Amino acid sequence: MALFRNLGPFHTTAIGHGEMPLTIENNRGHDVGIETLHASLDAGCRHIDTAWAYYTPGEEEQTGEKLVREALDSWKGPREEVTVATKVGLRRAWEGDKPVWPRDGKPEHLIEYGKQSAMALGVDSIDLLYLHRHDPEVPYNESCEGIKALLDQGVAQWAGVSNVSIEQ
């Protein structure tokens, strides 16, 4: 039996499934990704974490969010019990032969990415949306205003931040 906790207004499992390794470089393929998410859900997991930037650089963007949508659409369990969190504010690129994670905290881009995330996930409103990482080129409060705009527009129900320091 899974242990449940409150995450803001959501009553969800204390342990969630981080989707990143299923869609970034060196992943084991689409079908294995679907099977893996189904196995987690079947085992009682009710929280999935993904991000706009979970894809292999140079390939289709947002494959992580799209994989989560497909897994939830094809899963035979109670979809309404599953909380999905996603993040915006990072992109993917290559520097030589090394994958990198450029930051993009411009409010207008965060708003665009948030709307794209809702579409990729197939939802009217994202359960929980995070600012993925602070962009040092953009004042922190400006990035937060972009996230707040997504809340105000109903694109996301709740918001948070990820990978930040106490000072930020």
Show the residue positions of the predicted features.
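Gly/Ser/Thr-rich helix-start
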Residues: H17-E19, E65, L90, V155, ...
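Active-site-proximal loop/turn and secondary-structure-junction residues that shape catalytic pockets
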Residues: P21, W52-Y54, V88-R92, H132-D135, ...
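Short beta-strand segments at enzyme active-site cores
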Residues: H47-A51, T83-T86, S125-Y130, G160-V161
